[in-house]
Every structure is written in structure tokens, then in C-alpha cells.
């Protein structure tokens, strides 16, 4: 199924990125206004997304995850599916970034510990946005690796990924997020 970015937002209403200091979304305003008018989508603070969303894409820089979740209100993530698109990368010394996760302490695991009542699924963190919702490659259908502790949450993420056009391989529990995160260094 070919899905445009607008169709993706219309179907899954999600979000987004932030300007870390102001708890506001930071996307192309023209796109957001058009999306809002055409699809009745809405924008808001991290807190509003956490309260409203049932499936939330967490797309911050790795070092901004804790602030984004804390600003949102940890309690608002209870029973929500959190698709963790983050990577544990430190860009403070420039490029290439430093990989900061260790076995047993991946960013996915840290997020799950921070919001224990949420259902965190690591996915989409090793691909570029231009193929995220339309992964058509000459070589064939690509495989998306996922990991998480809740089987229903992983089914939700699998459905989203398959709607986009991905084959999905479930690596197991959230402790496997380290293996997926480590692949980000190959992509960068």
C-alpha cells in the first residue's frame, strides 16, 4: 500500500519533533497548517499529544527523550503504545556521533523504565524519513526490525509498518532494542 505522509497522519495522527526548550512542535508550519485544514489534524504540546494519542511516535534526539517525556507527564503514557524512533547518539563532539547505549541499557530500555505503564516498541529508528511511509526499493520489500515487551503493542506497530509496505521481524523483548539501535551507526 502506497501511503503519503498526509495519509499517514490522517490515519495514525501522531507526532513529532520538538524544540526542546519550549515544549512545542517544530515542523514546517505550512505543512502543518495544510495538514490541519485538509485532514482535521491538530498540533499541540508534548503533554497534549501524550494525553490524546493512543499510538505515539517518539521522535526526539536521544538526549532529549527524558525531558520530552517528563514535560509530557509520565502518567499520561499509561497503556499507550510508544513507537520509539530514537537513537542513543551524542552529537556534542560533532560527527560522527558517539553511540551511548550499552548491552542491558539501550535507550529503548531506558524509555520503558521511565514510563513503565506504557508499551514501548523500538522501530523505525534505522531508516530515513523518505522511505518510512513508502519503503519501495528496487531490491524488494525491506524488513523492519522491532522489539518490545507487549505483544499487542507489537501487533499494532506491525500493522502500521505493513500498511506502509514493510515486512516486519520481531526480535523479542525491549532488551533487544540495543541490537536495533546499534544498526543506526551503520546508517549514519
Model-derived features with residue positions:
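Short amphipathic alpha-helical segments
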Residues: 6, 68-72, 94-95, 134, ...
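Short beta->alpha connector loops
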Residues: 61-64, 126-128, 150-152
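Rossmann-fold NAD(P)-binding glycine/threonine-rich loop
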Residues: 78-81, 85-136
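Internal alpha-helical scaffold of NAD(P)-dependent oxidoreductase catalytic cores
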Residues: 113-120, 138-177, 181-186
